[in-house]
Amino acid sequence: MARTIDLNADLGESFGPWRMGQDETLLELVTSANIACGFHAGDPDVMAETVRLAVSRGVALGAHPSLPDRQGFGRRPMALRPDEIRNLVLYQIGALAGFARAAGGRLVHVKPHGALYGQAASDAAMAEAIAAAVRAFDANLILVGPAGSQLVRAGQAAGLAIAREGFADRRYEPDGTLTPRGRPEALIEEPAEAVAQALGMVERGEVTARDGTVIPMPVDTLCLHGDGPDAAAFARRLRMELAARGIPVAALGGWLSGAA
């Protein structure tokens, strides 16, 4: 049987009446939702509504904690102590878990956002602080991070189940990190190329870096960015291609076992 893959999207990133992304449409296409917890985007009303919609569609709930940086959308690196990282992650997980419980759902995973995700990929102390926060809240939660990263290693060391994430529409560097968003070639804008990259990670566990190097990239979940105008169309196309290859799509909590 073909291996199973999860499809996730970063959602709940609106503020008040200002709308961002295509959350309602994407919730019909993805299996897991990473929901902003107020530190880079979202607010209590948006969090509550996004959780409600996800629960009503059977989409797995995930907390998407960030560094405290609304102006920079959580994408600016910060130098914080490990205890500060642990506390801000724990705070945000707890906030989203409250909305999940109120809506009759439960948290399944935690995926850091933006600079928190990027820094923790290579910073062992930051990664360990994030893993400690997740374990302290609920040792049954799945920690999502890039394959081969310090974040994944920290999750395994903490005894957590981990999910290795790949990005369909982002280019990679030869060391396996994402090409910085500031570079003009950071995003893959041609849908066919993005689909091919996603299939390469799922079927062969590899990706071609920006310089042409083929590097290992085994994945359990693929991130589909929801803020582009063609996000929903791309998600439909990818699901169709996966189905054509007999690759099941399902939320992490339904099939991913503990990896530690």
From Swiss-Prot:
State how it assembles: Forms a complex composed of PxpA, PxpB and PxpC.
Q: Offer one Pfam family short name for this entry.
A: LamB_YcsF
Its biological purpose is as follows:
Catalyzes the cleavage of 5-oxoproline to form L-glutamate coupled to the hydrolysis of ATP to ADP and inorganic phosphate.
Q: Recorded E.C. number(s)? A: 3.5.2.9
Cystine pairs annotated here are none
Domain of life of the organism in this record?
Answer: Bacteria
Which HAMAP family does this entry report, sorted A to Z?
PxpA (MF_00691)
**Upper taxonomic lineage:** Bacteria, Pseudomonadati, Pseudomonadota, Gammaproteobacteria, Methylococcales
Protein name from the UniProt record: 5-oxoprolinase subunit A
Record-stated family: Belongs to the LamB/PxpA family.
| Reaction it catalyzes | 5-oxo-L-proline + ATP + 2 H2O = L-glutamate + ADP + phosphate + H(+)
Recorded source organism is: Methylococcus capsulatus (strain ATCC 33009 / NCIMB 11132 / Bath)
UniProt keyword list: ATP-binding, Hydrolase, Nucleotide-binding
Write down the InterPro entries for this protein, in alphabetical order.
Glyco_hydro/deAcase_b/a-brl (IPR011330), LamB/YcsF/PxpA-like (IPR005501)
Record GO terms (molecular function): 5-oxoprolinase (ATP-hydrolyzing) activity; ATP binding
Coiled-coil stretches: none
**CDD domains in the record:** LamB_YcsF_like
* Gene transcribed to yield this protein: pxpA
Q: What GO terms in the biological process aspect are recorded for it?
A: carbohydrate metabolic process
Broad class of enzyme this protein falls into: hydrolase
